[in-house]
């Protein structure tokens, strides 16, 4: 039996789509030196090649892909978006605005200089910034711009072409810039990170290991009684001196949970909870009696929970003010916008931050009730909330404003982005509402993006040969300029206007470009995870601004003549 593969793929859109995805994902795993191509560029290259052979898919698949992607971007940004926008993220907001705004203006200028159409210009901006949200926002706005079908088809094809030609240029140039730009300025990044560490009491180890606290029991001997000198537990401050706290005491056969007024007596058996290294460093006074095994004394369930910051008595306060150790709990991690932050006593908590806390189950539950709620450990997605807010986003996108002879529609990209932000924000405030496991959210976002990339590549592939010959050299120059010049402008603004610490500044710059590979290079250069503070500060707001930049470039273009 003979099978005509071309006819088979042309006759089955679903089969063609998944063939493109599979081949593209395989290609995306290849590396050019230390740079991995990535899923987006892999799928785009394969789809462009097949598009040249006149393969195509239904445009509805493309539309659904970008809608799912941009909605999930909003959901991820939601928990921290408003806190960054309205309160303590002024510098980060300004940096993101400078980065995105300067890139937008430069792209508009180069597009007019080289005589490109809006499709090539917007695609070049998206590729140079390695930003799919720009591509999505521009594509959606073009479809609602009222262009004639022939003009729209050319603009959308050129949008894909511009993105494909400049994406690798943008990625590689930013990675090279992240490696060498810190060396061209007079402040050493490692020194800057250490300075912040000294000022704020941060843990700078990017590879810090996290251990569960353990419980051990000791019999109180004469040396410990003499050391206590009649002081109660509150006065002794045992945790501050040892890194352990007394969870239980057995005295005269009676088991009790001590309060701060308890005084240690000869013969008491005490259960100490702390990290393994804290037990190892215990003064001999604690162990001079004898370590004991008492099933009841040691019967404590140590748990590790992720607590979402929500309550007003925690939001806006410094981490040290929570006094977790006073409540018998140990902080393992602080996560903001999916970025692990350094353990910083002075970091100001935002609504939606996640604290990974270990300790006795009862104590952890008490702390969680005080500052927020324990994140649901469930694999079940609240599909009702997902679908409802998706519908709301589409309805918002239908809104059109009329100004004399000019009409402006919000569009699906902005509508879905706003609806996603609201769902993410509400989820951070209501533990039982709108829960989407992070793995499920990542899968839907990645799948939507890959479907979108496959669609734009197949639709643009037939014209890539002619386009590459006509504008290839111009695209190379423009891609480098739009990728690197805004980074330099952002550095100068942050260093000499905002006077930011260099470690935080470079992290924030990579966050404004939403480029994780470049962020890893900055952390390696600083030999610290302190730049993650800056990265998390700009990342959420930059994703939103980049989507709006894709919309704005299409709206502004006709007015430039």
From Swiss-Prot:
Family note: Belongs to the AAE transporter (TC 2.A.81) family. YbjL subfamily.
GO CC aspect terms: plasma membrane
Localization per record: Cell membrane
PROSITE patterns named in the record: RCK_C
Major site of localization recorded for this protein: membrane
Domain RCK C-terminal stretches: 200-288, 292-373
Alphabetical keyword list: Cell membrane, Membrane, Repeat, Transmembrane, Transmembrane helix, Transport
Top-level division of the source organism's lineage: Bacteria
Single biological process term from Gene Ontology: potassium ion transport
Spans traversing the lipid bilayer: 8-28, 32-52, 66-86, 94-114, 158-178, 383-403, 406-426, 447-467, 475-495, 540-560
Gene Ontology terms for molecular function: monoatomic cation transmembrane transporter activity
HAMAP family according to UniProt: YbjL
Protein's name according to its UniProt entry: Putative transport protein CKO_02260
Membrane topology recorded in Swiss-Prot or TrEMBL: Multi-pass membrane protein
């Amino acid at each position: 039996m003979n099978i005509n593969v071309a006819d088979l793929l042309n006759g089955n859109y679903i089969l063609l789509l998944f063939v493109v995805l599979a081949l593209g994902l395989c290609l995306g795993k290849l590396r050019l030196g230390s740079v991995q191509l990535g899923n987006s560029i892999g799928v785009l290259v394969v789809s462009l090649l097949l598009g040249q052979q006149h393969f195509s898919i239904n445009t509805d698949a493309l539309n659904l892909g970008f809608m799912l992607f941009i909605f999930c971007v909003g959901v991820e940004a939601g928990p921290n978006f408003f806190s960054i926008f309205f309160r303590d993220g002024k510098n980060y907001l300004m940096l993101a605005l400078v980065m995105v705004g300067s890139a937008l203006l430069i792209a508009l200028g180069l597009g007019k200089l080289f005589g490109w159409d809006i499709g090539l210009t917007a695609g070049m901006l998206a590729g140079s910034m390695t930003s799919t949200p720009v591509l999505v926002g521009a594509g959606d706005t073009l479809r609602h711009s009222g262009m004639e079908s022939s003009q729209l088809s050319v603009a959308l094809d050129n949008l894909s072409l511009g993105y494909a030609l400049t994406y690798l240029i943008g990625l590689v140039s930013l990675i090279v810039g992240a490696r060498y730009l810190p060396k061209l300025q007079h402040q050493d990044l490692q020194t800057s990170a250490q300075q912040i560490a000294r000022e704020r009491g941060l843990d700078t180890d990017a590879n810090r290991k996290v251990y569960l606290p353990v419980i051990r029991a000791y019999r109180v001997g004469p040396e410990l009684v003499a050391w206590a000198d009649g002081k109660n537990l509150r006065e002794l401050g045992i945790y501050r001196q040892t890194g352990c706290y007394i969870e239980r005491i057995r005295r005269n056969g009676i088991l009790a949970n001590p309060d701060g007024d308890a005084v240690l007596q000869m013969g008491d058996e005490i259960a100490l909870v702390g990290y393994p290294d804290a037990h190892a460093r215990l003064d001999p006074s604690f162990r001079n009696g004898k370590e004991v095994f008492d099933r009841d004394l040691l019967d404590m369930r140590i748990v590790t929970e992720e607590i979402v910051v929500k309550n007003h008595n925690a939001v806006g306060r410094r981490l040290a003010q929570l006094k977790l150790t006073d409540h018998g709990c140990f902080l393992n991690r602080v996560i903001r916008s999916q970025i692990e932050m350094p353990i910083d006593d002075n970091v100001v908590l935002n609504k939606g931050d996640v604290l990974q806390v270990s300790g006795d189950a009862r104590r952890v539950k008490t702390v969680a009730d005080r500052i927020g709620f324990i994140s649901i450990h469930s694999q079940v997605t609240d599909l009702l909330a997902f679908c409802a807010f998706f519908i709301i986003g589409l309805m918002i996108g239908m809104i059109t404003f009329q100004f004399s002879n000019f009409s402006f529609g919000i569009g699906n990209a902005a509508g879905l982005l706003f609806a996603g932000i609201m769902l993410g924000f509400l989820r951070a405030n209501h533990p039982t509402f709108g829960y989407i496991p992070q793995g499920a959210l990542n899968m839907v976002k990645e799948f939507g993006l890959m479907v979108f990339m496959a669609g734009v590549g197949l639709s643009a592939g037939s014209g890539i040969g002619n386009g590459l010959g006509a504008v290839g050299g111009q695209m190379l120059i423009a891609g480098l300029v739009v990728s690197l010049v805004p980074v330099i402008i952002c550095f100068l603004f942050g260093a000499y206007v905002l006077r930011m610490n260099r470690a935080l500044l470079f992290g924030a710059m990579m966050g404004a470009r939403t480029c994780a590979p470049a962020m890893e290079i900055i952390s390696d250069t600083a030999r610290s995870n302190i730049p993650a503070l800056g990265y998390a500060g700009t990342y959420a707001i930059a994703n939103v601004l980049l989507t709006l930049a894709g919309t704005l470039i299409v709206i502004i273009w006709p007015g430039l003549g």
